[in-house]
């Protein structure tokens, strides 16, 4: 008597998004089906292996053979030393300790880029532009704790995420005000990267610069407080800082779009923009994005999307694992 093969025989798969504070784990139980998401504080576990075992025990998962972890680190070989947590481990030794057939690691923003390929339209908010060109490159940029930058190019095997450190490219001031802000930062830091401004700490730096320029004592405000005061019209200085932040993001995003030829769209990830969607639609971002002289019409056609999905790192890890297993 013959039996029908189970096309999901290698499920469930373990996927994770590991940061310095929390590790988010989930099970992919079928293609693009993510279940049992759990957040574990990293400080409560001595090793990544301990955290994984705790999650598997908590979720009741059995028969897990394949796993992928997105992690806030460059992946340069077998040894991983987290820069913002004490966990350090060998990928191969961890695979063996967990009894897995497959364990792959990828940079967390590379995972976020891959997640774009699986994001549904309901989790995207378009800000200007027209329709994306099918199979054209896509640009992915994410201001948050830092500034993640990636791109997606299509190949016969599917979408490939470009792993780079574009957030650390030199920042290009656009006007006299941005030159003043750049000069203030240059006096504090040896290299003024795009990330110096396009991050939570960057918003605080812009605000600080404006306050000093006006010979005012800058209040000790968290980035979230600057944003809140700006959106509630409680502080003209905070509003100016947020306007400049969005304009700077427009410059950097359009530079990336031109570099990649990203007629497939520009995708904004990270934790900052989704907190101010109504404002962002009418912020200086889009006008600055298109302000490129002879290439204004080229950029005007490129759609920009704010990514709203809740766990893009986990979705991207699942996409990376699926791509890997197709090719082994």
From Swiss-Prot:
Subcellular locations according to the entry: Cytoplasm
Top EC class for this record: transferase
GO biological process: glycolytic process
Amino-acid positions noted as binding ATP in the UniProt annotation, renumbered to this chain: 16-21
GO CC annotations on file: cytosol
Entries under Pfam families matching the protein: Glucokinase (PF02685)
Annotated family: Belongs to the bacterial glucokinase family.
Entry protein name: Glucokinase
Organism listed in the record: Neisseria gonorrhoeae (strain ATCC 700825 / FA 1090)
